[in-house]
Swiss-Prot record:
This is ATP synthase subunit delta 1. NCBIfam families: ATP_synt_delta, PRK05758.2-2, PRK05758.2-5. GO terms for cellular component: plasma membrane; proton-transporting ATP synthase complex. Keywords: ATP synthesis, Cell inner membrane, Cell membrane, CF(1), Hydrogen ion transport, Ion transport, Membrane, Transport. One of its GO terms (molecular function) is proton-transporting ATP synthase activity, rotational mechanism. Transmembrane segments: none annotated.
Length: 177
């Protein structure tokens, strides 16, 4: 875990709690995404690394962000600038969306298959995982031809390996025992 992630977590939590209270999760997600993109811009990155005062940094950052931020979002920028944390915006954004997904009972699921899955297969996998995990599932599918056949599903700490490669490995281990 990076230092910026540790630094970002309390800011993300504060922004998340505020957004939940105001019923503005999507708006705050958009503001933080924009701020993360701004903070990652090379010119802005160099500016943030400079010797400007916190007040001036906040002012410049707010001008760059323009109408994207409401007064509460601008307050977050000011607080982060005062604490020298504007560089942490990408991590704040990442942590905010982790909290948002947890709050909305959503989970990203990585599905790796030997061949491209049909829409029916994706729908079936999604449906079964939603039942098992009691969450809305967002599938991210990829292809790995070395699997031969089958799928590997990763959802958080859960890994379901139903690939031909893993079955062959288990058979090989059983035969060698």
């Amino acid at each position: 875990m990076s230092d910026l992630t540790t630094i970002a977590r309390p800011y993300a939590k504060a922004a998340f709690d505020f957004a939940v209270d105001k019923g503005e999760l999507d708006q705050w997600g958009q503001m933080l995404t924009f701020a993360a993109e701004v903070a990652q811009n090379d010119d802005v990155h160099n500016l943030l690394s400079g010797s400007m005062t916190a007040e001036k940094l906040a002012e410049v950052f707010i001008v760059i962000c323009g109408e994207q931020f409401d007064e509460f979002g601008q307050n977050l920028i000011k607080v982060m600038a005062e604490n020298g944390r504007l560089m942490a915006f990408p991590d704040v954004c990442k942590e905010f969306f982790i909290l948002k997904k947890e709050y909305e009972k959503e989970i990203d699921v990585e599905v790796t298959s030997a061949v491209e899955l049909s829409e029916e297969q994706r729908a079936e996998i999604s449906s079964k995982l939603e039942q098992r995990l009691a969450r809305k599932v967002q599938l991210n599918c990829s292809i790995d031809e070395t699997l031969l056949s089958g799928v590997i599903i990763r959802a958080g700490d859960l890994v379901i390996d139903n690939s031909a490669r893993s079955r062959l490995d288990r058979l090989s281990d059983a035969l060698q025992s």
